[in-house]
């Protein structure tokens, strides 16, 4: 077993029981009782059972010195990035010495990512929209759409007039301002998020509009290949060595108008990943979690599940399983899709599920009960699991089954589930050592890059003052343990990660 998990908690419980009995069975002073309780909490915390070696202790001492200094300054000034909206805090995070260390840290894997939200939008604007044959149109609602075609794309009711972007840029007075306007349409970033996004409906509307806007750029075959490569490059530069991507596998098109199917897309993911590994031999690779939107009818989802079964049979090393994406609050519940989701089991076919569940503020509804239904349907991991702390029995069951939650703090904040990340419900789960991994969801749409920003928010905000190098190490190892890789692949990954970790520790401890 790569990392100690909940199956090994009985030994810890015995130790904690011994600690408890020591002060219940004897007359301890208040100070002694206090010390015992603090020790108990320390051991329960995520990573609390890890024993650091000498070098790690030295690195931890330096890291915590910087962290405590930054937090004390925040207490003095009341300017604390995790308590602020990410759009307003990002520049402060980038000044942080702790953040610089987190960027250096080998983070293992990113296990919760969406296909067209993971490459920085600046690349999309400065690179992709400057390529030949790129056209733009504006729908009657004023929403941008893009299409590569020669000579021009086919017109429709939504796009009655296409303009070659190269010609359009020649006509605008300020090209830089135009490109900046594209960036504003490709991300949620704004200087005044509380004013612009007054509620969850508003921010989700813009969020889903962005996917509609950029889809025509990314799903052009030459761009698609480059996009997949660029996504690996950006995460590799952020010291992430493996990615699992939720992908809807929408049709990819050629300049001629020809369209490719899901198999072509999966094969392209596979080929591009192999090409990337050739020049980055420590990179483990990528897997695809085929996904469909939870707004669709049951019959459509049933067909998507059959497609997922076929893709996994044909590409067992690439396709990890299936998920449902889209806003939970307005989409179908897992219970609605139960019959469709039972198709693989009834047919004797193994199709792993990686369900989004509990990405909501509401309690006692079919929405937050998605967490329960995800577990009943044998989900491998729980995407977000924001509502898990409100369901103690479900929480205990997921812990017993060793099913982790995928925590995406910046996404949860930007999409208005929580404003101050110190109040994120996963803080309670971290304090008790619940299985979890950290990921970044759609970092490009939030103006972020890679995984480091989310790690910063967790380490500084959600984990509180006591989260230290043990916490970070446990999270990195968890990302390997809970990945969809085979055990032999996890062992290889762990060896590569360990070498990088030791170098990172030496750098932090000595520089």
UniProtKB/Swiss-Prot annotation:
**Family recorded in the similarity comment:** Belongs to the metallo-dependent hydrolases superfamily. Adenosine and AMP deaminases family. ADGF subfamily.
BP terms from Gene Ontology? adenosine catabolic process; inosine biosynthetic process
Q: Subcellular localization, per the record?
A: Secreted
Instruction: From the UniProt entry, list the residue stretches annotated as the region Dimerization.
Output: 30-100
User: One Gene Ontology cellular component annotation?
Assistant: extracellular space
Pfam families, per the entry: A_deaminase, A_deaminase_N
SS bonds (residue pairs): 137-159
Protein's name in the database? Adenosine deaminase 2
Q: Which cofactor does it need?
A: Zn(2+)
Q: Which UniProt keywords apply?
A: Disulfide bond, Glycoprotein, Heparin-binding, Hydrolase, Metal-binding, Secreted, Signal, Zinc
Q: Could you tell me which SUPFAM superfamilies the record lists for this protein? A: Metallo-dependent hydrolases (SSF51556)
What UniProt notes about the protein's domains is: The PRB domain is involved in receptor binding, and may be responsible for the cytokine-like growth factor activity due to it's sharing of several structural properties with chemokines.
Q: Which reaction does it catalyse?
A: adenosine + H2O + H(+) = inosine + NH4(+)
Quaternary structure, from the entry: Homodimer. Interacts with adenosine receptors. Binds heparin.
Note how many cofactor molecules are bound and how.
Binds 1 zinc ion per subunit.
Q: Where does Zn(2+) bind?
A: 112, 114, 356, 441
Q: Which residues bind substrate?
A: 115, 204-211, 293, 326, 442
Q: Active site at which residues? A: 359, 384
Q: Which residues form the signal peptide?
A: 1-29
EC code(s) of this entry = 3.5.4.4
Gene Ontology terms, MF aspect: adenosine deaminase activity; adenosine receptor binding; heparin binding; proteoglycan binding; zinc ion binding
